[in-house]
Every structure is written in C-alpha cells, then in structure tokens.
Amino acid sequence: MAETWGSEIMTQALGCLQAFSSEFALEWENSDMKAAIFKLLLGWIVLSLTAIHLAWKSYGPTVNSIYYRQGMGGQNGGTPEYPARFPIWESSSTESLKRHQE
C-alpha cells in the first residue's frame, strides 16, 4: 500500500513539473521582454554570488579569526567567562532551594 501511495505521489509530482516546464517554455518563446528581464536578473545573481565568493576567498580568514580566536577565555579569546558587572550567583550543595508554598 505504501509503495502505491509513493508511486502515485511521484507520478503526480512529475506530471506537475512537466506541465510547469512546458508552460514556462511556451511563455519563454512568446515573451521577449520577460526573457530579457529573466536573463538580466539571473546575470545579476551570478555576478553577486561570484563577487561574494571572491571577497570571502580573500577576506574569509580575517573574518574567521575575528570571531574564532584561539586562547584563554572561550570562543572570543580574552572574553572572561563571567562579565564583571554581573554578580555570580553561587549556591552550595548544603543550601536548600527555596520553594513556593501556599
């Protein structure tokens, strides 16, 4: 039964994809303006991703070293474990926890 449902779902999905692609191809042939805008936006995305890749290739290690410093104090290098302006609330094991009682 599970195989039947799976094959029906795949058949429907492939049918929808085929209908969409044929409709897209027909629309592509009929509309030069949409095709030009699509090509322009696709080129812009490819150019942007290429620029991001090149920038990360040259500046990536610098950015990475800023956020992941090696050394004492955890992830950010010299950062203390507890900030100085906040008190550390410590409790000993002999101290009972306060509970709400009605």
From Swiss-Prot:
It comes from the Eukaryota. One of its GO terms (cellular component) is membrane. The chain crosses the membrane at residues 36-56. It is found in: Membrane. The keyword Translocase does not apply. It holds the Pfam family T_cell_tran_alt. Its main location: membrane. Keywords: Membrane, Transmembrane, Transmembrane helix. It is a single-pass membrane protein. Belongs to the TCTA family. This is T-cell leukemia translocation-altered gene protein homolog.
